[in-house]
């Protein structure tokens, strides 16, 4: 079993990423943290959209869905909610379906090979998501890849540091896994920039503070508070959106 880390979705365009790999997609601030909180609050399904138009159309097709979105940290016009884990932590989402589109995180999910297994990872569910990835890698006799969502195509410090943290967790649980240079680099970044320092250094963190959304950092920069692991299970035929569920839940088709 091997572990590779990609610091930007664009890296996947230069190779032929194996479809059989297990991909952990990271957007610490905030998409993958938010998805994890959504399932903690009882969500039945989260549908990930690449564009605002796709999300709005998916909301129109199925009344009752909660339309969630973010562009440049703000909630787009016409959306019910933004991309705030702190906001969703106060909501009862039991058996609800949510549509989510964000600047970086949901797009990164689409960047993975179409038929690949994709998990949403973050500091908040670090131990749980790595354990699930290892379980699936053994089950499918495949490797693990960690993909950082980055920020508008640029390197994101918090995603890379979280990749290092998840790599440490994988090595702790699976010490014989073969690692590559990218893993060494990510672990070194995490050791230099743990969450307590990311709070002050990561541009995404500074942007949230500047826009009065610092409450989200209490979720984005906290380790191992959740056992929820959002997982892509397919594509919704009517909308083309990625369907995510928490593996412990059962999705009943309507």
Regions found by a protein language model. Give the residues of each.
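Structural motif
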Residues: 3-4, 21-24, 44-46, 64-67, ...
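Phosphate/ribose-phosphate-bearing ligand recognition and processing surfaces
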Residues: 149-159
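Long, charged alpha-helical interface segments
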Residues: 80-107, 111-117, 131, 157-254
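Glycine-rich anion-binding loop/nest that anchors nucleotide
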Residues: 122, 144-151, 174
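Acidic/Gly/His-enriched mid-domain segments of enzyme catalytic cores or analogous surface patches
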Residues: 47-137, 147
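Short acidic, Gly/Ser-rich segments with clustered Asp/Glu that frequently serve as metal-coordination loops
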Residues: 10-13, 23-37
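Charged, flexible boundary elements
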Residues: 1-11
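Active-/binding-site microenvironments in catalytic and ligand-binding cores
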Residues: 19-21, 29, 37-46, 51-54, ...
